[in-house]
Amino acid sequence: MVISKQYHQEIEDFVFNLVHKYEDQQRDEQEKTHFSLKPQPSSVVLEEDYKTASSNSVKKIKEAFSVVGSVLYFTNFCLDKLGQPILNENPQLTEGWEIPKYQQVFSQILSLDGQEIQVKPKRPKSHCFNCGSEEHQIKDCPKPRNAARISEKRKEFMEAYGEASNQNFQQRYHAEEVEERFGKFKPGVISGELQDALGVTAKSLPPFIYRMRQLGYPPGWLKEAEMEHSGLALYDGKDDNETEDEGYLQPKHVTYDVSKLINYPGFNISTPSGIPDEWQIFGSIPMQPSQQKDVFAHYLSNFHAPSSKSSNKRTAPQPSSHHSKRPKDDLEVAVADMDIDSDVEVSQRSQTTNSFQFQPPLPPGPPVISTPPPLPQGTPPLTPRSLTPTQPSTPTHPPLPNTVSSLNPSSDVSQPKIVDSTMDEDTLTLEELEEQQRLIWAALEQAESTNSDSDIPVDTPLTGNSVTSSPSRNEVDVVAEVRSDKMVTLETKFSSISEQVPENEHSLTSPNPDNSSLNLKEIPDNSDSEGLLDNTVPAPNHEVNDGESIVDNKVVTSTESSAKNSNPVPDMSKFAVGIAPFEFENMTESTGTYLRIRSVLKNSPRNQQKKKT
């Protein structure tokens, strides 16, 4: 013990020197060192029993089924990129996998020298104004309420919340402030900071200049140069219809202020001296003469395009100036196009306006007046009014091209009509054709009204004999269809017959002597309507004497019989089957109800109250 205490320092120095000597020796003799670390599972052979396999098979399996890890082995050390092996697959239990945690030393942002950083105040959290706890609100506070404390805390909270809200959300931006903030940025001028950011120097053009040559002038800055208009029009009160119409119908035009065009060196103005034009390197195009500032300004000064902001809701398909420049003849034709609504009149107008077309002559003789079918039994007798139909009042100013001889309604044989058509169709005007059409419709309507008055007596009831008297109404439809067929027959004869047939004289007699009264009724009406029908169709110069051919009589008679058979409307007697007449005499049981309940109404509470008052 005495020796150890006496030589303690020497023994310690000897051991220290010995260890130091050993370390120096190991460092000098690197080839004699060996790596004694335990092997890590960086490469695992996926084989159940690899010991029993041969060496070749083990080598193949190791090459094909080996999981290579991230451990890199060196001479003196190994490097694992993923860290040390995980102990029980838990990084918390493995040394070296702990994530270091550092304490926060600074609570404020560090500022540079001579600068002050303004820290925005935090928005206060909602808490209980009574006890100050953030876990619940004042309505859930278990402590007794202190009104003074609640009022004070609420006031402090609202003040703090208002300051934070004013700084964050209730800040207004004005155009002047924006201009001051971005006033240092000017279009077309590249600052030194922007050159550093783009990686260009003052002796070279920026890359976007070459791209602008392909895309053109920036549309955003072109919009800035656009001049706004109020859209208000001022009229001086003078009767200048042409100027007013042109000013009202013309769309708004966009004008530009050429003084606001921006200079871009290398794009719309010449490149400064000493700066090369490297458009080939950037795959662009050289400067275009059309993109020069003076050329573009001249184009914008003469540019007149409709603005997208124009709110002209009333648009006309054609300006009124076009109508004023039309000749008078064109205006008359346009009016005729709108007024004409008949196929016959349209065909006549087209023939007169385009060119002269040959019209074949009419067949000899007037249109045949066929005998209508006999009326069924039970038809009431004819009234004297049907024998003398009144003629419609016709104006005298439009001259009629044809003259019709009057017929004698008292005879059974109809007198043939003598038609003198000496007027060409080109001489007829639109007004004359319209007047003739109006006369035809008036005659047809009067004939139908006359037939309806004669067929249905005034005192005939609708019940009982309505079935037997109904066919007389249907006769009017047959007569109207026969007249329409006659009109079609006349038009067909115009285009089909081109030869003049010798004139013959025949008298039209009734084939059935029992229907003399019916002929007396139909002949005056048909003569009137057919006479007007002859006036509607203009024909070339020809003469038609009283007479007709047997062939024409057969054709018209067959047409009328087919029109009668092809009537799609059934007889009115079929509609009355199973229909009981409704007469007011059957409603006697429902009358007198109010008289029976009037006594009950007198005793109602409302009437009793009225009597008391």
Swiss-Prot record:
<feature type="compositionally biased region" description="Polar residues">
    <location>
        <begin position="494"/>
        <end position="519"/>
    </location>
</feature>
<keyword id="KW-0539">Nucleus</keyword>
<keyword id="KW-0862">Zinc</keyword>
<dbReference type="Pfam" id="PF00098">
    <property type="entry name" value="zf-CCHC"/>
</dbReference>
<dbReference type="InterPro" id="IPR001878">
    <property type="entry name" value="Znf_CCHC"/>
</dbReference>
<feature type="compositionally biased region" description="Polar residues">
    <location>
        <begin position="304"/>
        <end position="321"/>
    </location>
</feature>
<dbReference type="GO" id="GO:0003723">
    <property type="term" value="F:RNA binding"/>
</dbReference>
<feature type="zinc finger region" description="CCHC-type">
    <location>
        <begin position="126"/>
        <end position="143"/>
    </location>
</feature>
<dbReference type="GO" id="GO:0071013">
    <property type="term" value="C:catalytic step 2 spliceosome"/>
</dbReference>
<dbReference type="Pfam" id="PF04046">
    <property type="entry name" value="PSP"/>
</dbReference>
<keyword id="KW-0479">Metal-binding</keyword>
<dbReference type="InterPro" id="IPR036875">
    <property type="entry name" value="Znf_CCHC_sf"/>
</dbReference>
<dbReference type="GO" id="GO:0005654">
    <property type="term" value="C:nucleoplasm"/>
</dbReference>
<feature type="region of interest" description="Disordered">
    <location>
        <begin position="494"/>
        <end position="546"/>
    </location>
</feature>
<protein>
    <recommendedName>
        <fullName>Zinc finger CCHC domain-containing protein 8</fullName>
    </recommendedName>
</protein>
<feature type="compositionally biased region" description="Pro residues">
    <location>
        <begin position="360"/>
        <end position="383"/>
    </location>
</feature>
<feature type="compositionally biased region" description="Polar residues">
    <location>
        <begin position="462"/>
        <end position="473"/>
    </location>
</feature>
<feature type="region of interest" description="Disordered">
    <location>
        <begin position="344"/>
        <end position="417"/>
    </location>
</feature>
<dbReference type="InterPro" id="IPR006568">
    <property type="entry name" value="PSP_pro-rich"/>
</dbReference>
<feature type="compositionally biased region" description="Polar residues">
    <location>
        <begin position="345"/>
        <end position="358"/>
    </location>
</feature>
<keyword id="KW-0863">Zinc-finger</keyword>
<dbReference type="GO" id="GO:0006396">
    <property type="term" value="P:RNA processing"/>
</dbReference>
<dbReference type="GO" id="GO:0008270">
    <property type="term" value="F:zinc ion binding"/>
</dbReference>
<comment type="similarity">
    <text>Belongs to the ZCCHC8 family.</text>
</comment>
<dbReference type="GO" id="GO:0031124">
    <property type="term" value="P:mRNA 3'-end processing"/>
</dbReference>
<feature type="compositionally biased region" description="Polar residues">
    <location>
        <begin position="404"/>
        <end position="414"/>
    </location>
</feature>
<feature type="region of interest" description="Disordered">
    <location>
        <begin position="304"/>
        <end position="330"/>
    </location>
</feature>
<feature type="region of interest" description="Disordered">
    <location>
        <begin position="448"/>
        <end position="473"/>
    </location>
</feature>
<comment type="function">
    <text>Scaffolding subunit of the trimeric nuclear exosome targeting (NEXT) complex that is involved in the surveillance and turnover of aberrant transcripts and non-coding RNAs. NEXT functions as an RNA exosome cofactor that directs a subset of non-coding short-lived RNAs for exosomal degradation. May be involved in pre-mRNA splicing. It is required for 3'-end maturation of telomerase RNA component (TERC), TERC 3'-end targeting to the nuclear RNA exosome, and for telomerase function.</text>
</comment>
<keyword id="KW-0175">Coiled coil</keyword>
<dbReference type="InterPro" id="IPR052115">
    <property type="entry name" value="NEXT_complex_subunit_ZCCHC8"/>
</dbReference>
<feature type="compositionally biased region" description="Low complexity">
    <location>
        <begin position="384"/>
        <end position="394"/>
    </location>
</feature>
<feature type="coiled-coil region">
    <location>
        <begin position="431"/>
        <end position="451"/>
    </location>
</feature>
